[in-house]
Amino acid sequence: MIERTLVLLKPDAVQRALIGKVIQRFENVGLKIVGMKMVWIDKNFSKKHYSAHVEKKFYSGLENMITEGPVIAMVLEGLHSVELVRKMVGSTEPRTAQPGTIRADFAQHSYEYTDSKGKAIKNLVHASGNIKEAKQEVELWFKPEELHIYKTVHDIHVL
């Protein structure tokens, strides 16, 4: 099934100059970027994006982390893109992420460390958790006119 999913390269990924390396991984497996922009979100937008977490103990650290610098927001399209991106990104805690995933390869944080510092875990990437969430997040982050339809070589060989 062809799906669209939201991916955010968080401020730690941007500040560490990992944008190209992360995007290349998604393109290498045939995912198509149909929307992309750099934005610096404020606390109000953070509350909209992380609405499920606003009342949780860790939210203030999460809000500080996501608003500390620019974010690359992308909509990726492809076959089973929600599931594929989640597999590629890896476990939320980089310490437990499987080797070969983005978080295992590029992030170092653990819950133990970040909890001791009172900060949110820096895990480089946000990826929609399921198809329903992906639809909601894409609509929150992108206007319809910011999403594009075009063909790639993968359309010929995969779809």
Where are these regions (language model features)?
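Non-catalytic terminal and connector segments of soluble metabolic enzymes
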Residues: M1-L159
